[in-house]
């Protein structure tokens, strides 16, 4: 739980930190991973012997569950039993495991430790042909019965419960009675006939098809809000792209490399959201997911987050702002980005494919440690870069860093509040009754990231003054002054300098005293909230040398 919470807050810290000079970095750090819509249509081959099928979903009221059977004729007798149960707590279906079906059914019959209501019915078929003819259940239909001490209330209200009839046809749909989490279980008991050979005992006798359809076709109540959210996010990213293209077209001659990367991150985010929305639409109308589309979406998300973190590190190091090149540090940046791409891609693919669940959970651990190390690296680099900008007294670049750092502080505070809220509401409660709001746990982080991306776009928007953010080393100015000095001497050679009388008015002393006062204020008084928020870090020998070099040039 702690690892998952850190994975949610660390991307916010990470993106916000580095995205200051480089807006597109923000989008790359994705929040909590997306869990794509679950399928609502299954084709299950049923072998000889006893078999179970189950699913747990949050369903709309009047959602229909349709059972279909198809296969070759057989002489085996079949006993088909189904259970449909609603739950008051989402934990009951979330923690339900397939290998616990038999014990769960025993508790259901004994009404032990369960909540909600349930329906059940059973029918014996003499052979497969009888099953394929859509025979009906009769006599074994059980009314919905409340659990957990609500027997008396159920008896009083039993006469008010209405059904479509005394018999339910096997191929007729079952129907839910309220918006709630549901568990559906089908038990197929198959007895081999005496005439059938033993070697065919394990062969697939028939195929059972289960379909779940509600007001929005195959889309369930837990997936419908996320589909709407991804549709809105697609529109938002399209607007971001149009706005960025318009700015870039107006000032295309003065575009910086950073602004090209911002456009690339916007495009990746738009593409990622479109793939997820298309997957939800496919589930809605076909009931089955396209696994390749899910894998593509997860890989796009991993590339986007890795690119964002790499760019944030580069910008926090001052590349293009106070340094013309990174030198040997560039290799460290590339390795960090490659490692994050590897771990995030592995975790996403394992999660959406449903294979190796334990490995997918373990993939969170290296991601958490890597995010921690990268955040610490960004904090140190960002502090050093802001110190150099203060020494150079570059007000424009320093203001850019401060504005985004203030945004960072607010976003980190908001992320902490959201983590506390989601933990208290969804994770540590014994009965998760607010299942209607589960989609917010994923959507809130993506919404927060989009807001930060918009702030980055505003700070780094293309304009006529783009070059004010470009790297301008002080050494070039010194070289120009040195080249101008001998030319001035030759121009005025042979001319006499008139002596000027020094006026002892004390002006020089006053100016020197003012400079000393300003220097003391600059060194001892923090100039903004960012100086207080970012802790003072010990200067290394290399930092002292750089600081001394910058001061000597200014003097």
Curated annotation (Swiss-Prot):
Expression by tissue: Highly expressed in sensory neurons responsive to mechanical force.
Annotated TM spans: 226-246, 258-278, 306-322, 326-346, 362-382, 404-424, 438-458
Keyword flag Mitochondrion: no
Biased composition (Polar residues): 502-511
Family listed: Belongs to the LU7TM family. TMEM87 subfamily.
Quaternary structure, from the entry: May interact with STOML3; STOML3 potentiates the mechanosensitive ion channel activity associated with TMEM87A.
Cited function: Potential monoatomic ion channel gated by mechanical force, implicated in normal touch sensitivity through the generation of mechanically activated currents. However, a direct channel activity is debated and an alternative could be that it functions as a chaperone for an unidentified mechanosensitive ion channel. Could also be involved in cell mechanosensitivity regulating cell adhesion and migration. May also be involved in retrograde transport from endosomes to the trans-Golgi network (TGN).
Cysteines joined through disulfide linkages: 74-128, 89-431
Keyword Signal attached: yes
Disruption-associated phenotype: Mice lacking Tmem87a are viable and born at the expected Mendelian ratios. Behavioral indicators of touch sensitivity are profoundly reduced while non mechanosensory modalities, such as heat withdrawal thresholds, are unaltered. This is associated with loss of sensory neurons mechanically activated currents.
Region spans: Disordered: 491-515
Listed GO CC annotations: Golgi apparatus; Golgi cisterna membrane; Golgi membrane; plasma membrane; ruffle
Name by which UniProt lists this protein: Transmembrane protein 87A
Pfam families per record: GOST_TM, TMEM87A-B_GOLD
Sorted UniProt keywords: Cell membrane, Cell projection, Disulfide bond, Glycoprotein, Golgi apparatus, Membrane, Phosphoprotein, Signal, Transmembrane, Transmembrane helix
List of glycosylated residues: 79, 157, 160
Leader sequence segment: 1-21
